[in-house]
Curated annotation (Swiss-Prot):
GO terms for molecular function: 3'-5'-RNA exonuclease activity; magnesium ion binding; polyribonucleotide nucleotidyltransferase activity; RNA binding. Residues 626-694 form the S1 motif domain. Its cofactor is Mg(2+). GO terms for cellular component: cytosol. Belongs to the polyribonucleotide nucleotidyltransferase family. Residues 557-616 form the KH domain. It comes from the Bacteria. This is Polyribonucleotide nucleotidyltransferase. It is found in: Cytoplasm. It catalyses: RNA(n+1) + phosphate = RNA(n) + a ribonucleoside 5'-diphosphate. Mg(2+) binds at D490, D496. GO terms for biological process: mRNA catabolic process; RNA processing.
Length: 704
């Protein structure tokens, strides 16, 4: 039995402990990460043989176990089901910095599983899982060029904070996750409250310093317990064969690549590849290693396209569609595309097009987020759909995949910063982005279309937001940064760096790369170039619609907010919801009440809203000493009569307060059902109300 080994350090001021050798020993590599009281088991496994595929088959899973926070899953079967949106996003977050750290041509299937077993809310399980995933690979026999590490960075009052607590996260104006190796950053995910490029770069470098410490800690562990790496067969091609094909077809491929229109370009490129494969299929038809050689020919044909595109950009400074390196494709935008929806915006950038639709609903329609974190809700929701027809293909349709969930979340982060507060705009807001055409940067097109749809719907956003995707082609020593990358440049380039923001600053950032890291200089230049492009796109958006519409759509619900005392909530709701349901039945409105007494009344009929407000005001009206009421007698007792002052509140007229003269029998003065004028004379400590008819009679006599 392998002896358990424990390694300790601190991370963001909290203890970080790694256990190896006791759990999951049949995996190629496994570690138990303890970060404070957060515990994550990370295990990495690789197939023994390479798969016959033209991509690296890596899968990262992040499994949230409800027992980690002392909960039993809801629903009938009482067990965890499909991953939550947060789990899906976390799996993507871990995958992105790890994927570039495998050798090109490695085709063994690799699966990394992270099981969240215990959660302390202030010690993020996501970052513990990223750390564990890297370390499980690093100590295993799986070929891996890591380790990598990731950290969360916030900023409070101008000071950067490492791995903010739940309380600190509510105060921060930057929410950044950054990952990398000890040499360079290779993944970024961020939301921010309109911060400058300089401040965002500062946050990245602050996080990078912490990353280097975590990587050094992993290297110590690998030196102590790491396994020798397995020998694997990487797909390699014959150098002479590659030179022969490149010499024969380079110029033909260059002509094909420079076809301006996307679909036509794809046809021309495929023609060249097919020609290469056909010629060499015939040439090698009698060769004893025909299958292997044809596999190499297929790879060389792909390499030919890649090299042509990259050399065009880095050497000739020409892009496949003829644009300059910092040139944005043709822009166009429209609003009010759909007649019955609450708001819509269409944004087109070259051959990428997104239609965004805004729907407004009462606050009660907000989304509840119930997972391993603190239970929360959100009233702004952004969804992204990518149908296959957008790229001229057939394919799977149905529930969103990881990519769609990730792009939707990026758009939500970018736009959430400019959504008005609940007090200023008491609506739940849902944006749905339908990608209708795609040739790169569709997530950023959805952000631009979302801005248009919000303004068309009359949402009083703080400022318009635009997004742009930056690219990179690097040969190690030299690099070229591209503005507004199209699909081919994304596919064959080294970086996809998405930047969204207003004219005043960045609201969202996402970076993925295919190389093992990028420098501070590249980050700085990419951010500066992105800012220039963002301003150009914002000008297009505000030319189409300069400001949010002053009136909501006639089809949007009208919402009024009123405030009642929290103690009065029970009076509005009534026993078993009887009172509130009667108001809803009578008026047809939708009513939402929070624990602070904020009442939202929604309906398409403004008159019914007014009626509901009047009823609620009557229900919650306070009885005050000195007020006069026309009250109805509801009960007779020997000592006096009980009268109803307002709905839900009765008062007592003591027999001595019925008249100026002595009264022996209450019913000599009032009878059940009578209406009498009374004045409130006292409200005792128990809330009981005493009223007097006699006091009003005396006042009348004085006036006479």
């Amino acid at each position: 039995m392998t002896e358990k080994q424990v390694f300790k350090t601190t991370w963001g001021g909290r203890p970080l402990e790694v256990e190896i050798g006791q759990l999951a020993k049949q995996a190629n590599g496994a570690v138990l990460v303890r970060y404070g009281d957060t515990v994550v088991l990370s295990a990495a496994v690789a197939s023994k043989e390479a798969k016959d595929v033209d991509f690296f088959p890596l899968t990262v899973n992040y499994e949230e176990k409800m027992y980690a926070v002392g909960k039993i899953p809801g629903g009938f079967i009482k067990r965890e089901g499909r991953p939550s949106e947060r789990a899906t996003l976390t799996a993507r977050l871990i995958d992105r910095p790890i994927r570039p750290m495998f050798s090109e041509g490695f085709r063994n299937e690799v699966q990394i599983t992270n099981i969240v077993m215990s959660v302390e809310q202030d010690c993020t399980p996501e970052m513990a899982a990223m750390f564990g995933s890297s370390l499980a690979l690093a100590i295993s026999d799986i070929p891996f060029d890591g380790p990598i590490a990731g950290v969360d960075v916030g900023r409070i009052n101008g000071e950067y904070v490492l791995n903010p607590t739940v309380e600190q996260a509510e105060q921060t104006d930057i929410e950044l996750t950054v990952a990398g190796t000890k040499e360079a950053i290779n993944m970024v995910e961020s939301g921010a409250k309109e911060v400058s490029e300089e401040d965002m770069l500062g946050a990245l470098l602050f996080g990078f310093d912490a990353i280097k410490e975590l990587v050094a800690f992993q290297e110590e562990i690998v030196a102590a317990v790491g396994k020798p790496k397995m020998d694997v067969d990487l797909l390699q091609v014959d150098a002479d064969l590659k030179k022969e094909i490149f010499d024969a077809y380079y110029n033909t491929m260059k002509t094909a690549v420079m076809t301006e229109e996307k679909l036509a370009r794809e046809v021309e490129i495929d023609k060249v590849k097919d020609t290469v494969k056909e010629v060499y299929a015939e040439k090698f038809s009698e060769h004893e290693e025909e299958a292997q050689l044809l596999k190499e020919v297929k790879q060389i044909a792909e390499d030919l396209e890649k090299d042509v595109v990259r050399e065009l950009i880095t050497i000739d400074k020409i892009r496949p569609d003829g644009r300059k390196l910092d040139e944005i494709r043709h822009l166009s935008s429209e609003v009010s595309i759909l007649p019955r929806v609450h708001g819509s915006g269409l944004f087109t950038r070259g051959q990428t097009q997104a239609l965004s639709v805004c729907t407004l609903a009462p606050l009660g329609e907000h989304q509840i987020i119930d997972g391993l974190g603190v239970q929360d809700s959100k009233r702004f929701i952004h969804h992204y759909n990518f149908p296959q027809f957008s790229v001229g293909s057939t394919g799977r349709a149905g529930s969103p995949g990881r990519r769609e969930i990730g792009h939707g979340a990026l758009g939500e982060r970018a736009l959430a910063q400019i959504i008005p507060s609940e007090e200023d705009f008491p609506y739940t807001i849902r944006l749905v982005a339908e990608v209708l055409e795609s040739n790169g940067s569709s997530s950023q097109a959805s952000i631009c279309a979302g801005t248009l749809a919000l303004m068309d719907a009359g949402v009083p956003i703080k400022a318009p937001v635009a997004g742009i995707a930056m690219g990179l082609v690097s040969d190690g020593e030299n690099y070229t940064i591209l503005t507004d990358i199209q699909g081919l440049e994304d596919h064959l380039g080294d970086m996809d760096f998405k930047v969204a923001g207003t004219k005043d600053g960045i609201t969202a950032l996402q970076m993925d790369i295919k190389i093992q890291g990028i420098t501070e200089q590249i980050l700085t230049e990419a951010l500066d170039q992105a800012k220039k492009a963002r301003m150009e796109i914002l000008e297009e958006l505000t030319t189409t619609i300069a400001a949010p519409r002053e009136e909501l759509s006639q089809y949007a619900p009208k919402i009024e907010m009123i405030q009642i005392k929290p103690a009065k909530i029970k009076d509005v709701i009534g026993k078993g919801g009887e009172t509130i349901n009667s108001i809803i039945d009578e008026t047809g409105v939708k009513i939402d009440i929070d624990q602070d007494g904020n009442v939202s009344i929604a309906s398409s009929d403004a008159e019914m809203i007014k009626k509901a407000i009047k009823i609620i005001e009557e229900l919650t009206k306070e009885v005050e000493v000195g007020q006069v009421y026309l009250a109805k007698v509801v009960r007779i007792e020997k000592f006096g009569a009980f009268v109803n002052l307002i709905k839900g509140k009765d008062g007592l007229i003591h027999i001595s307060q019925l008249a100026n003269e002595r009264v022996n029998n209450v019913e000599d003065v009032v009878k059940l059902g009578d209406e009498v004028l009374v004045k409130v004379t006292e409200i005792d400590k128990q809330g009981r109300v005493n009223v007097s008819r006699k006091a009003l009679l005396n006042e009348e006599n004085k006036e006479k």
